[in-house]
């Protein structure tokens, strides 16, 4: 059985954490101060249209 941590395993996408995050603050369910974002249905609909 071959494991992913095996020596010499080819990592195809080493840079998967680089670049912009997929989730934007505009579509987050909670704000940075911990309050809940209003109108969740509109927020989720807008997130799907991007």
Swiss-Prot record:
Q: Name one GO cellular component term.
A: endospore-forming forespore
Q: Which domain of life is it from?
A: Bacteria
Where do the record's region annotations for Disordered lie? 1-50
What upregulates this protein? Answer: Expressed only in the forespore compartment of sporulating cells. Disappears after 45 minutes of spore germination. Expression is sigma G-dependent.
Q: Which UniProt keywords apply?
A: Sporulation
Q: Name one GO biological process term.
A: sporulation resulting in formation of a cellular spore
Name this polypeptide is given? Small, acid-soluble spore protein K
- Composition skew (Basic and acidic residues), residue ranges: 1-33, 40-50
Q: Where is the signal peptide?
A: none
What species was this sequence derived from? Bacillus subtilis (strain 168)
Q: Which Pfam families match?
A: SspK
Annotated family: Belongs to the SspK family.
Where in or outside the cell? Spore core
